[in-house]
């Protein structure tokens, strides 16, 4: 073993090479760091507080180094601009002759430094770029070599470490937001408010425990879904020769040659060396259909292996091996663990994209504003506190309370628990939520993007029949023919697919199965020739080569060998089927054929074109060696297959409700523009009474290509808009942009094709244009105009057709960049990347494909989207409600503290407990989590911007009202004949708790709690009315009864009472221990609560101090002597 020389200095930061094992979680740069242990020991609290701020930790506790042996950690900057600090070590790099290189793990993916390229690179088995012949010539690994590879690549398993409950609790408790809580607990402890401290600790621990239990449950479920420990047969070299041994699947290393002899769930990604099979990739794509896989073509020895173009030869981890066509399937393992395709999906789930923190950022700013107001209040009373010689420690407490009450630490926990309750409600409705952060985000959704097939429409399709080109007759069945002389289209229907027969049942893509059934020919497999075939009479039609369907080609094709089993004569055909536009582009099409296609599409059918060409016997070997593009050139179009794809039963009703609620609805489909438009018109997403503009593109050789803009009238007549008068390319773009702007203003609908996306992608490549927001303003005006044109089309278009998976992701990303909150709904197949890109993703797939989405519906009904949106509105409104209410209550309590300190008093520990627990700014907001969503979506104009005029005004109004109520209570008390003044602290130089100020302000706060809860409540259109929350109503009634406010019994009108406003004072026996003596209720205008004849009496000022008005249960008014008052209260309280 050779040891590397690692003394050479390295540049910081170091770039990271792209690989095929990172998936979406890529990293850009790595910086070598050395940890300063002394600083971490001295400033360990800072290290904990900044644990989620790697950039801060880097500056404080680490220093950059340029030598590998000096580095203890690395600073990682990811492609999504998140950053991490990871531990680093030296590891042998077998790709560089065993030299030691610096190595680290980021988000479960291993990276190692490559000296030759001066780049870091994710650890992967090198196969991409190798020729098929090189791969086919791989030999079994030596037994000793396997152990080295396992140490380098890791075990072949997706091992998800479910953190222990205590580990998760520690993560929760060390979040920076909780440090305010700890600060508050320390202050409360010094102030000897032990019960209040205990209540806070218990509630915090309980809420965090529930959250941690939920997280563990989700992770355990994911871990169970990833477990796939099985036994496999592997070929190894033991020094004397090759042998077949059975080992556990997790002990397989990349490069191992494995033999499959039975059906199994694949535990790794592998490439087929020998044999063919049928698999279902439902665990990956969400589509439970049989897919044929075959061995790599050994006769194409110079062809290069690429994962994207070699899917027909690649088996992915998690797929189910349904049928092995021959006795054995020989494969070479290429990707394992989190580097496999499934592993990449799981990594993306475990490390989701950073969510929008706008609400949190606004909350911090509003908290600072409130803290400023409290500081002003504190400073305004400071001179008084100093004049009465209040001990400095007490003044310090009041100052420190600013931090506690302006940024209540329990607030994030309350918001989290309401989100948790929302997820549980969704689970009861067969909707699984993966990310609690998306619970409130669903309430902000503005734009809904839907895949068409399987989402808006049913998964199943019906084959109506077919038409031959130039004929308008639709054949709903194959015409009777001589079985030994069937038509060319009959041959094509029977073999141009990847359908297989398992247990006498045809399995495969639904459209392929329908076509194969339509052909009526028997389908089988020839074990000797190792080929699928169909048969009719004496003829067999063998499939000798398959070009699988790919979104880039929009077609699938086969090379067919027709054999007469009696005469042994044979012919060769090339059959192709796919999008009709694709087939027409490959053949010479007459205008009549285009009109025929247009007629079929306008009837709303889903159309496949099909064609063929016969291959001369002398050319067949050369033809098989041609590329796919060359094989598909110059085919002869035959006609069209006609399918009908019906809407789901509830689609129309649900979409109508979305439209009435003013959501921006977009359909993003891979189907052709006209079919997608017809579905959109049927759902009234597009107004069929208005013209529709289709944006398309056709690349033409030797001619400068531009967008093709076609306008379709309501009567289905079409017109290609002519821009030939443009003087140059920029003028051409300006004219097209001007036309589109006018079309938008005239309420014309737009359909944007995938080829139009390709036009802008081509523009970006040839003209060096960047569509990234941070680069837009740095480019010249002509370029900015193109970017604006593209963005304008994406934002204003409602129908996207012939869209490839990566284009769907681009659409969602551009919508997000235009400040829209986007929800993507798909079936989990070609929509995974777009679903993950969206702010909220919803999938219908009951498979591992579901893990790309925030929510997974176990039913196929579109109503699940409605439920998610309704629940999101509840969570969002609860979050705003809790934030505003919790903050107002905290401010109210702090103002009470300041006021009481002004009069040598403070709240007792018991009163603090009562305020915090029974009166409920804690319990009540927990109960608010039980607010239920509405039954129907309504138009919402809810603004969760905490700095909106309404929200700021309501908070400031509440703040003002609280101050006025405190002033009113104190002034009323001072004017009362029973007022007793307190002029000093108690004998032990502590606050006095048994004072009238204490009781008055305590009851004032309790009553104001109800005002805060009710005034901040957000009902329709976000959630049900407050009175429909049964638990909250009963709880409130219980508090009212406890406070003796259920029945108004005594009203005392004081001299200074303003007309129309009353103070309701309930007197209690002063000997009632240290409890409450006077309750003051500052109400709204009394005529809202009392009959008119009473209002007339109450608005008169009563100047006799000993006159008392008692309103009993029979609503009669009595005048009694003041002495009777105490007797009355002694009997009734």
Curated annotation (Swiss-Prot):
Stored Gene3D superfamilies:
Calcium-transporting ATPase, cytoplasmic domain N, Calcium-transporting ATPase, cytoplasmic transduction domain A, HAD superfamily/HAD-like
Q: Which UniProt keywords are present, listed alphabetically?
A: ATP-binding, Magnesium, Membrane, Metal-binding, Nucleotide-binding, Phosphoprotein, Translocase, Transmembrane, Transmembrane helix
What would be one Pfam family of this protein?
E1-E2_ATPase
Chain ranges passing through the membrane: 7-28, 35-53, 168-190, 194-212, 364-383, 397-418, 888-906, 916-931, 949-972, 995-1018, 1031-1050, 1102-1124
Q: Which residues form the active site?
A: 451 (4-aspartylphosphate intermediate)
- Report the EC code(s) recorded for this entry: 7.2.2.-
InterPro entries documented for this protein:
ATPase_P-typ_cyto_dom_N, ATPase_P-typ_P_site, ATPase_P-typ_TM_dom_sf, ATPase_P-typ_transduc_dom_A_sf, HAD-like_sf, HAD_sf, P-type_TPase_V, P_typ_ATPase
Reaction catalysed? Answer: ATP + H2O = ADP + phosphate + H(+)
Gene Ontology cellular component terms for the protein in this record = membrane
Location in or out of the cell: Membrane
Family of the protein in this entry = Belongs to the cation transport ATPase (P-type) (TC 3.A.3) family. Type V subfamily.
Protein name per Swiss-Prot or TrEMBL: Probable cation-transporting ATPase 9
Q: Which organism is it from?
A: Tetrahymena thermophila
């Amino acid at each position: 073993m050779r040891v590397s020389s690692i003394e050479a200095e390295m540049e910081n930061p170091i770039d990271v090479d792209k690989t095929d094992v990172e998936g979406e979680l890529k990293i850009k740069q790595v910086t070598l760091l050395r940890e300063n242990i002394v600083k971490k020991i001295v400033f360990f609290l800072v290290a904990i507080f900044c644990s989620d701020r790697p950039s801060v930790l880097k500056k404080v506790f680490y220093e950059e180094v340029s030598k590998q042996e000096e580095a203890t950690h690395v600073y990682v900057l990811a492609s999504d601009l998140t950053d991490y600090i990871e531990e680093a070590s030296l590891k042998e790099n077998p790709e560089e002759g065993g030299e030691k290189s610096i190595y680290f793990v980021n988000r479960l993916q291993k990276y190692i430094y490559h000296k030759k390229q001066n780049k870091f690179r994710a650890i992967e088995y090198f196969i991409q770029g190798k020729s098929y012949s090189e791969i086919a010539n791989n030999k079994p690994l030596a037994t000793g070599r396997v152990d080295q590879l396992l140490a380098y690549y890791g075990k072949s398993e997706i091992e998800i470490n479910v953190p222990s409950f205590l580990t998760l609790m520690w993560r929760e408790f060390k979040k920076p937001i909780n440090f305010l809580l700890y600060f508050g607990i320390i202050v409360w402890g010094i102030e000897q408010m032990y019960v209040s401290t205990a209540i806070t600790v218990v509630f915090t621990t309980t809420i965090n425990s529930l959250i941690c239990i939920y997280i563990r449950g989700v992770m355990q479920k994911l871990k169970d879904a990833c477990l796939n420990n099985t036994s496999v047969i592997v070929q190894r070299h033991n020094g004397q020769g090759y042998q077949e041994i059975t080992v556990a699947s997790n002990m397989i290393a990349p490069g191992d040659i494995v033999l499959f002899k039975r059906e199994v769930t694949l535990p790794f990604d592998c490439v087929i060396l020998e044999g063919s099979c049928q698999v279902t990739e439902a665990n990956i794509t969400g589509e439970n259909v049989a897919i044929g896989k075959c061995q790599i073509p050994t006769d194409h020895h110079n062809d290069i292996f690429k994962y994207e173009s070699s899917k027909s030869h690649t088996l992915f981890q998690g797929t189910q091996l349904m049928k092995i066509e021959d006795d054995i399937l020989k494969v070479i393992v290429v990707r394992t663990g989190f580097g496999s395709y499934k592993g990449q999906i799981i990594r993306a789930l475990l490390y989701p994209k950073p969510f929008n923190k706008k609400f949190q950022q606004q909350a911090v700013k509003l908290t600072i504003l409130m803290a400023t107001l409290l500081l002003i209040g504190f400073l305004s009373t400071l001179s008084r506190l100093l004049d009465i010689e209040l001990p400095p420690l007490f003044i310090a407490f009041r100052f420190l309370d600013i931090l506690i009450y302006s940024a209540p630490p329990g607030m994030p926990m309350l918001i989290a628990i309401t989100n948790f309750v929302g997820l549980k409600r969704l689970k009861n409705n067969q909707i699984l939520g993966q990310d609690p952060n998306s619970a409130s985000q669903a309430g902000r959704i503005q734009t809904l993007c839907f895949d068409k097939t399987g989402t808006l429409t049913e998964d199943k399709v019906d084959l109506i029949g077919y038409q031959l080109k130039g004929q308008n007759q639709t054949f709903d069945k194959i015409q009777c023919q001589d079985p030994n002389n069937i038509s060319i289209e009959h041959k094509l229907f029977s073999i141009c697919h990847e359908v297989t027969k398992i247990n006498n049942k045809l399995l495969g893509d639904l459209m392929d199965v329908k076509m194969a059934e339509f052909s009526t020919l028997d389908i089988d497999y020839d074990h000797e020739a190792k080929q699928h075939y169909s048969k009719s009479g004496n003829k067999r039609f063998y499939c000798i080569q398959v070009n699988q369907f790919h979104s880039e080609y929009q077609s699938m094709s086969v090379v067919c060998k027709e054999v007469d089993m009696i005469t042994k004569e044979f012919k060769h055909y090339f059959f192709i089927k796919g999008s009709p536009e694709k087939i027409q582009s490959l053949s010479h099409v007459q205008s009549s054929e285009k009109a025929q296609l247009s007629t079929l599409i306008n009837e709303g059918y889903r159309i496949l074109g099909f064609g063929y060409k016969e291959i001369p016997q002398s050319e067949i070997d050369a033809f098989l060696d041609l590329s796919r593009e060359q094989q598909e050139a110059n085919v002869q179009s035959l006609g069209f297959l006609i399918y009908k794809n019906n809407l789901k039963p509830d689609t129309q009703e649900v979409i109508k409700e979305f439209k009435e609620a003013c959501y921006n609805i977009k359909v993003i489909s891979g189907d052709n523009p006209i079919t997608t438009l017809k579905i959109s018109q049927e759902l009234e997403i597009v107004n069929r009474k208005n013209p529709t503009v289709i944006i398309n593109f056709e690349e033409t050789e030797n001619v400068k290509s531009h967008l093709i803009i076609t306008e379709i009238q309501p009567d289905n007549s079409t017109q290609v808009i002519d821009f030939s008068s443009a003087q140059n390319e920029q003028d051409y773009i300006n004219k097209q942009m001007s036309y589109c702007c006018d079309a938008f203003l005239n309420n014309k609908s737009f359909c944007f094709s995938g080829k139009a996306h390709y036009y802008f992608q081509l523009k970006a490549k040839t003209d060096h244009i960047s569509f990234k927001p941070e680069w837009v303003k740095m480019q010249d005006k002509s370029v900015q105009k193109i970017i604006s044109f593209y963005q304008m089309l994406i934002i204003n278009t409602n129908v996207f057709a012939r869209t490839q998976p990566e284009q769907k992701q681009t659409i969602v990303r551009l919508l997000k960049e235009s400040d829209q909150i986007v929800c993507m709904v798909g079936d989990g197949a070609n929509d995974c990347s777009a679903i993950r890109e969206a702010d909220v993703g919803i999938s219908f797939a009951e498979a591992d494909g579901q893990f790309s989405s925030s929510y997974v519906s176990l039913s196929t009904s579109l109503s699940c989207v409605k439920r998610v949106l309704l629940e999101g509105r509840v969570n969002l409104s609860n979050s705003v409600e809790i934030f505003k209410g919790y903050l107002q209550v905290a401010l109210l309590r702090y103002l009470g503290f300041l006021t009481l300190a002004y009069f040598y008093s403070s709240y007792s520990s018991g009163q603090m407990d009562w305020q915090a627990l029974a009166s409920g700014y804690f319990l009540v907001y927990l109960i608010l989590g039980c607010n239920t969503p509405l039954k129907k979506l309504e138009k919402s104009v809810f603004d969760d911007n905490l700095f909106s005029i309404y929200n700021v005004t309501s908070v400031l109004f509440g703040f003002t009202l609280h101050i006025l109520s405190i002033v009113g209570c104190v002034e009323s008390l001072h004017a009362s004949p029973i007022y007793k003044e307190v002029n000093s602290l108690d004998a032990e130089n502590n606050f006095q708790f048994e004072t009238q100020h204490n009781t008055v302000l305590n009851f004032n706060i309790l009553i104001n709690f109800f005002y805060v809860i009710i005034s901040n409540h957000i009902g329709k259109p976000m959630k049900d009315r407050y009175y429909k929350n049964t638990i909250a109503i009963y709880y409130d009634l219980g508090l009212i009864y406890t406070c003796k406010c259920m029945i108004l019994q005594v009203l005392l009108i004081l001299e200074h009472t303003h007309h129309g406003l009353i103070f309701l004072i309930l007197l209690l026996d002063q000997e009632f221990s240290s409890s409450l003596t006077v309750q003051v209720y500052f109400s709204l205008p009394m005529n809202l609560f009392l009959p008119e004849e009473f209002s007339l009496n109450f608005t008169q000022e009563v100047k006799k101090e000993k006159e008392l008005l008692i309103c009993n249960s029979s609503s009669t008014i009595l005048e009694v002597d003041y002495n009777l008052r105490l007797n009355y209260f002694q009997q009734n309280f």
